[in-house]
Amino acid sequence: MKKFLIIGGGAMGSAFTIPCLENKNDVVITEPYSKKFIKELSSKRKYHSALKMNLPKKLKFRKYSGDLLKEKFDLIVIALSLPGIDFIGKELKKNNINTPLLVLTKGLKYISRSKKIFTISEKLQKVSGIKNISVLKGPCLAKELARKHQTSVIIANKNINFAKKIGKRISTKYYLNEF
């Protein structure tokens, strides 16, 4: 993997770009909702108010659109808040995207009609139809990651070799991962 699209310009999505860029990946970040983050990420300084720091100059910001989703990426990283999961799932399906996903979003989704609880990856798979979905979980705070404090995460996928492939592209001395 080399070209990543990160959807979600909040604290975790933006912090996650740092180890990705350090591993020489081509990283594009986009933000579908927050005008504040859109303004910050598209500026020359790339100052992120939630992280209270400038993001790397190599980070590319692109305006969110269906056309952006259709571009060739090796991995799409979902870093939206829980309410954005349905939106992005529908967008991925509408644009016929089948790129592997890595989900950073934490939490569970309760569907009141069926009275069922879904993990975020289950919900995304159901809405988007994408089968290759990995999740990244762990005791990792965005500010710690952005400041390169040692932290660790677990990457899970039904195909452990694919999870390991992601791990190789994001692991650093301070950002450790297991599978």
Where are the language model's segments positioned?
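Conserved residues at beta->alpha junctions
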Residues: 31-32, 79-80, 157
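Rossmann-like NAD(P)(H) cofactor-binding subdomain of soluble oxidoreductases
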Residues: 55, 62-66, 71-149, 163-167
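Conserved anion/nucleotide-ligand pocket segment
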Residues: 148-178
